[in-house]
Amino acid sequence: MKIEGKVAVVTGAASGIGRATAKELANRGARHIALVDLSDEVHKVAQELNDADSGGIAGVFQGDTTDPEFRHQVFETIRAEHGVVQILVPAAGVTRDSLSVRLDKETGKASIYALDKFRFVIEVNLIAPIYWALEMVAQISEDRFARGLKRWKADEGLQGSIIFIGSVSS
């Protein structure tokens, strides 16, 4: 995958796999990297990347990756300032450690994993990454239409790359 000169978005960029991915994209010559995270730590990551680049390679979008309005605004802002997103790494993830079934050793009663926790984990780790990908594909489609292009043809090359991430904790 060609990274040099591309515009990228990395969610979960404040720590872990997201942070490491953002640094690697910078090392490989991405033109702009939008760092997305709920944590304030994302500003430190941007500062590190910008200090190393001296050209202001990284931008920060602090917010909730499950919020559709936030997601759309991130893509619209990037398109207006840097062009269409060409690389997406939706690496934001959460865990809510708990056994799926827990047996109380004194009472013998079993309790199951709380539904609200399960829904939250699925929303962040599965649904949100898919919708970030759909947002990118929609933006590429709009850009193609604006340029008078119709159906994609293989000789046009890649329009974008989406890299889904998983880990033991997510």
Language-model features: locations:
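Canonical Rossmann dinucleotide-binding motif of NAD(H)/NADP(H)-dependent dehydrogenases/reductases
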Residues: K2-A34
